[in-house]
Amino acid sequence: MATERKPILLEFEKPLAELEAQINQVRQKSAELGVDVSDQIRELENNSTQLRQEIFSKLTPSQKLQLARHPRRPSTLDYIQAISDEWMELHGDRYGSDDPAIVAGVARLAGQPVVMLGQQKGRDTKDNVARNFGMASPSGYRKAIRIMEHADRFGMPILTFIDTPAAWAGIEAEQYGQGEAIAYNLREMFRLEVPIICTVIGEGGSGGALGIGVGDRLLMFEHAIYSVAPPEACAAILWRDAQKAPLAAEALKITAADLQKLGLIDEILPEPLGGAHVDPVGATEILKTSLIAHLRQLSQMSSPQRRELRYQKFRRMGIFTQSAA
């Protein structure tokens, strides 16, 4: 018989764990003594719900980062397999490599043929090592664009799922052209004729995210993050102290709410109370409903109109000031 997995608690969730332990203790005593304490249990459960709502309504950027990295947060493959009517993974960059940090393939969403792809983190330590913790190599980005071009050739919309700390920054990655591979993807994704919807499901880290992140719509889960660099790296660069990562997380404006205010994302996807890992089925339904709605809107536009709007969307990003000569 399968045993229930022990929950993985984050630091800010410990008060909730203490309250849950108290509820279980009352239940156990009630069973032992044969006493009806349903009113007391109901009150404690209400307190637990209120406390959970209070905690998750006031999360700091650093706490949202912890949720985005939660080991049990649904992955790209989890979402693809859950929202697809059919799914067939495709492999290889046609240059001799097949990076497992990027998964890609053809699928059906609500009966419509689409291409789905994204970074894939491991489900355990061994799998994480095999998938390089979701950090793609140049081969991964070349595989991604090959399959996106396949989608464009056959008129299939493209759905990308972003979940990576960053692109792989090893010496071999540089030797094989990491910067060129990402830059090529950026250019080519602007040229594609089909609708493109990108969704940040966990971590959206730096150029690693951008390599599959050019689209007509950019969606983001409520507790996902999107940044120019991991907060730890930013803190190490600016203050020579990785312990200042929480301060960097505040300064980087990594949360969905911040990015929506800045006009960088199009929609925040609400998560079940406690995060997507608490109720993956609920999170999947939210994602699927949104993707279908956006696909319907984008399919009503002509290809030239979509491409122009995609281009202008990215041209509007960023703020700069210019002083008088």
UniProtKB/Swiss-Prot annotation:
EC number: 2.1.3.15
Stored SUPFAM superfamilies: ClpP/crotonase
GO CC list: acetyl-CoA carboxylase complex
Principal place of residence: cytoplasm
Catalytic activity: N(6)-carboxybiotinyl-L-lysyl-[protein] + acetyl-CoA = N(6)-biotinyl-L-lysyl-[protein] + malonyl-CoA
Subunit annotation: Acetyl-CoA carboxylase is a heterohexamer composed of biotin carboxyl carrier protein (AccB), biotin carboxylase (AccC) and two subunits each of ACCase subunit alpha (AccA) and ACCase subunit beta (AccD).
Biological function: Component of the acetyl coenzyme A carboxylase (ACC) complex. First, biotin carboxylase catalyzes the carboxylation of biotin on its carrier protein (BCCP) and then the CO(2) group is transferred by the carboxyltransferase to acetyl-CoA to form malonyl-CoA.
Family: Belongs to the AccA family.
Protein name: Acetyl-coenzyme A carboxylase carboxyl transferase subunit alpha
Organism whose genome encodes this protein: Cyanothece sp. (strain PCC 7425 / ATCC 29141)
